[in-house]
Regions:
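N-terminal lobe/hinge region of extracytoplasmic solute-binding protein
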Residues: 45-94, 125, 194, 507
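Gly/Pro-rich hinge or "lid" segments in bacterial periplasmic/extracellular proteins
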Residues: 78-82, 169-223, 227
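Alpha-helical secondary-structure segments
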Residues: 117-123, 150-154, 197-198, 225-227, ...
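Extracytoplasmic/peripheral linker and loop segments enriched in polar/acidic and small residues
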Residues: 393-402, 428-496
Length: 516
């Protein structure tokens, strides 16, 4: 039987990946043990650099994973043990729109200034009121922060806000130094950022490395490391090589084909762990786009064999899904998790019914090097779509250029992206599909979905709120403004001198990484 084009591509991709990376350091059986690096310095290799030190004006998980070591939240949430105090000592839900907080005393910023409730007010009201900031949509529910004393304050929301604590424990809510920024200005802050975290800024060589040093005045436990270096290494093979030669202690996004090689090298190991990240395609649904036809979107979905990509290209490092809200998140619809649809013959039939019997062209943009096997994945999808008559004009982009176009909502019919969820709540996963938030991106407009999402945003009844999100996910799965591929597992390379368990939310709290 004739093998499909994408099947041949998949076989070739697996063979080539299995042959790559071995020339620099020899075969898996013959690797030399890695050299131990400085015991007081931790080096982590990311695939991308930080995008900004403005914690309100980015929405990139890999950047947040660095920032959590420089800035503190009011509270933390790992998705397993619930909320824990960080800068806040205690909190109380006074009524549906009012939360009271008490700060820990004696906390200092890296420049020696004391943390007070004025800093909290400055931070949260900035992100809540400035609609030009990328994280504004996650905090515009805040009406006011009322300072009651140096260490006491209230947060007043515009409407009931059931997910407020989730928001205050994630990206965008790290507390900023009001006096320092107002005195020196934002330009100075962005060059010399100041937080309250266990590590403080030392040096940044853009697109190369960011170096942090221990904050000896930290209010919590003393930092475990004298220095932490985050290196930006986009190439998979280079990250692996640096891990094997001792140039880095931790390397993210290890290709599945390199796992055996790493595990056969003394002194290092590869660890596979689940994440919150769901890889997906976002499609334009407006009438002016070819993907505005629901039959076309369904055909695209049915033409993609997600399970084959997970099994072969990712070697099992993922779980197919028809929702972005994965188990462990408030509002998850587990009936849609672990499921995928694949029926290329029906896809052809749907395209014929939609008036595209002779096929059509569409634009697809994707990052190259940001996610595990992102380039190879979209190339396979391009081949799969060609099998049903869809010609894809594929644009592969460096992450910084892709991210800029993403912020500008400048993509064509489709783009490929992966979203994490450090809120552990369905609201973060689904808010982009309200009519207002979808405008200019997917242009999705389903009044029933919109009503469900807006109602859930304000519903203080936890059970009813979860049901609203679950129903919305069922409708979204049928409408397909987003086509979900798989929940991605992380494969992390680790020097065996370390104790380190990768987190579900992909954060690098470096003081949880310790020497054995």
């Amino acid at each position: 039987m004739k093998k499909s084009l994408w099947g041949l591509m998949l076989s070739l991709a697996v063979v080539l990946a299995g042959c790559s990376g071995g020339e620099e350091s020899g075969g898996a059986e013959g690797e030399e043990p890695v050299e131990q690096s400085d015991s007081k310095t931790l080096v982590i290799a990311n695939g991308t650099d930080v995008v900004s030190f403005d914690i309100h004006d980015h929405n990139t998980t890999s950047t947040e994973a660095v920032h959590v070591n420089m800035f503190n939240y009011l509270l933390t949430n790992d998705g397993e043990e619930g909320f824990k105090p960080d800068l806040a000592e205690s909190w109380e839900n006074v009524d549906d729109k009012t939360w009271s907080f008490k700060l820990k005393e004696g906390v200092k910023f890296h420049n020696g200034e004391d943390l007070t409730a004025d800093d909290v007010k400055y931070t949260l009201e900035r992100i809540a009121k400035d609609d030009t900031l990328l994280e504004h949509g996650n905090y515009n529910q805040i009406q006011e922060v009322k300072v009651l004393g140096d260490y006491e304050f209230e947060i007043i929301t515009k409407n009931p806000e059931p997910a407020l604590l989730n928001r205050l424990s994630r990206l965008g809510s790290g507390i900023l130094p009001k006096d320092y920024i107002e005195t020196e200005g934002w330009e100075v802050f962005l060059e010399q950022p100041v937080g309250t975290g266990p590590y403080k800024f030392k040096e940044w060589k853009k697109d190369d490395r960011l170096t942090l040093e221990a904050n000896t005045e930290y209010f919590g436990e003393a930092p475990k490391w004298e220095e932490v270096v985050f290196r930006s290494i986009p190439e998979d093979s280079t990250r692996v090589s640096e891990l094997l030669t001792g140039g880095v202690d931790v390397a993210v996004n290890i290709p599945p084909t390199d796992v055996e090689r790493i595990n056969n090298t003394d002194g290092v190991k590869a660890v596979q762990s689940p994440t919150q990240r769901v890889m997906m395609f976002t499609l334009r649904t407006d009438e002016g786009s070819v993907t505005g036809d629901p039959k076309v979107r369904e055909a695209i979905d049915l033409a993609i064999d997600k399970q084959a990509i997970v099994d072969s290209l990712l070697e099992g490092a993922g779980t197919v899904t028809r929702t972005r809200v994965t188990p462990g998140n408030v509002g998850a619809n587990e009936d849609l998790y672990g499921k995928s649809l694949y029926d290329p013959e029906k896809a052809k039939q749907l395209l014929e019914e939609a008036g595209h019997a002779d096929g059509f062209e569409l634009a697809l943009s994707a990052p190259n090097g940001r996610y595990l096997k992102d380039k190879e994945t979209v190339e396979l999808v391009t081949a799969m779509l060609s099998e049903v008559g869809i010609t894809v004009n594929l644009e592969l982009m460096e992450w910084s250029a892709f991210n800029q176009k993403y912020q500008e909502k400048g993509f064509g019919e489709m783009f490929y992206i992966g979203y994490g969820n450090s809120m552990f709540d369905a609201s973060l996963a689904l808010d982009r599909l309200t009519t207002e938030e979808a405008a200019g991106e997917s242009d999705y407009n389903n009044p029933e979905v919109n009503d469900l999402l807006l109602a859930a945003e304000q519903n203080m009844d936890a059970d009813e709120r979860a049901q609203q999100y679950q129903k919305a996910q069922e409708l979204i799965a049928e409408d397909r403004p987003q086509i979900y591929m798989f929940q991605l597992d992380a494969i992390t390379g680790i020097n065996e001198r370390l104790n380190f368990e990768p987190r579900l939310n992909e954060m690098f709290y470096v003081d949880s990484i310790t020497l054995k």
